[in-house]
Structure formats: structure tokens, C-alpha cells
Amino acid sequence: MRAEVLDARACLAVEPALSGCQDSLAGGLYAPDDETGDALAFTQQLAGLCRQAGVTFHFETSVTSLIAGRNGVSAARVVDATGSAGELCGDAYLMATGSHSAALARTLGESLPIYPVKGYSVTLPLAADAEAPSVSITDESRRIVCSHLGNRLRIAGTAELTGFDASVNAGRCAAILRRAQEIFPRIEPAGDAEYWAGLRPATPGNVPVIGRSRLDNLFYNTGHGTLGWTLACGSGQAVADIIDGRRPEIEFPFRAL
């Protein structure tokens, strides 16, 4: 990706919303080809296209374990929202279960170097005339990322090692909001802020686990850390190629098992 080194004046020309912090702005890196997208809207529309192609989704259903057969995985044990248990069988199995991948892989004796790293986001509803940034802003000193999504501004940041606790710490979210207001002091939210917390599936080297397992029909697409949305489409294409027995078109040093 192209990146340009800009001084403070050039940063303000690209993003006028930074004028509120111009006295402390030294400069920045600008990636003109960088883009921002709404992951929820994308996946909802993608699910609709998948249904049209014949895909069946089992929502509110948990995979509790995988069953190993003579020639690989023979079934996945599942439990739905009513507590009803069953099995799903297929020719190939793809594990894309984020931070829970390591525990699920252990049911087959597989070891994945994935651990949950907790992060938070704050989403602000914006008025039509809000002085919000039009480009994505990353502030390394404040350790936050700001993205303008339609009529909302989302600010994300922090990294906590709290196991699988995904509860929202309001104090952490309030701190993220304060840091964003230091950069954009003129933003007036059009409503209440929405606080959220999630678990990032991190690997020691920040490289995702993509490829075939030691079982011929089990494949991995997990461990993307903070870059799940960024790498989603490319990773999906790569693992689809691997499952089909093709060499991935995307050259990337995926973690090999």
C-alpha cells in the first residue's frame, strides 16, 4: 500500500477535521488507497448472496467438539439455542472460530497458538453537519483508531489479556472517548455513545493460521488478531483455493502447522 509522509499543514489539507488538534499535530502518514468499510453491513449482504446460492446457516448454534474418523474429521457436534444436540457432517471442515479456535482444535489433539486479546470500541451517532473525519485516523500515541461509517463515528482501541471475559468495561470505553475528543474536540454526538467489547484471536507473531491441518479434511482460517476485517476477503479466497487443491493466488507468509 502506498503511503505519503505529510507535515501538519498537509495533514489538515487531507483531513480538515484535525484542525481541532493542529497545535499538537506534527505530521502523519497518509495512505491514499486505504479504505473503510462497515463489516456488519458487508456480512449481512454476503449472507443474503450465500442463501441465494443454496447455503444454509445455523445461527445460535455452538460447535462443542469435532469427531475424528479414520480418514479425518467425520462430524461436528453441535448444540442449538434450545439445548438440542446433533451432528453436522461434510466432506471438508473449515475452522474459522476466532478466539475459540484453540479450544475446539484441542478436541482433536491439535494445538493452535491463539489467545484472546480483548479490545473495545465506542460508536457515536453523528449529526449531518458534524465535523467528523472523512478518512480513517490512527493515533499511535493515544492508541486509538477512528473510522467514519455513514452517520456514525467508531473509535476502537486498547488490548487486555482477560481470558474469555467479553464484558464491557465502561471506564475503558470512556477513556477511549476522551482520547478521541482530544483529537476532534468539535464533534457533538447526536445521541448516546454505544460501548462494545470483543476478543481478538491473536497469535505470537500476529500472522494468521491459514491452511490444512494434520487431518486431510480439516482446514484453518483463524488467528487474524486486530486485522480480521482487513484480511477477511483475501484469507477467504486463499483458504478456498487450498481446499480446492489449488495454490493460493495471494502470496502471503501464512503460519504453517
Language model features by range: what are they?
Residues D7, F59-T61, E194:
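Short loop/edge segments at beta-strand edges and connector loops
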Residues S65-V73, G86-D216:
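Active-site substrate-recognition segment that forms the wall
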Residues M1-R9, R179-Q181:
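Dinucleotide-binding Rossmann-like beta1-alpha1 core, especially the glycine-rich loop
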